[in-house]
């Protein structure tokens, strides 16, 4: 099945394309402007992106939204993970702000989770929705050179002490929130 990617994030698009490799994945149209993610839920933001791309291309569109929920911060940054340090913040700025907010949180109280909502919207209005979750903790400092976003400070419980940024991509995808959501979505699509 042909699916058009709604994400403009190259790292995220690559992860998704690897997981949905049984489908004909097309990149997001370059002439499509920014899609403002102004919903209060991950599902709402994923839907905004998928609907916009589906309407623009006439093909089913696949989108996701992910939030990092840190218990010591009351669930923040959550739906605002990509904009935690401001609307045009970089990954490094978001990561620095999170570590700064947590500087006084002891190692045993740094529990967190990544939550992903993955969604396909079809031209006829149908939707397929899937969820992925991974529990872990926030490290005291960045570690590892792979991944993107908060990967260098998130150590999944199933990661044998490594951060996502220290893992090989296949190992990360096998336990990650995004991997779980998109594998579930792939099953619903008939893979």
Which role fits each region the language model picked out?
Residues 1-4, 11-191:
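Anionic-ligand binding patches
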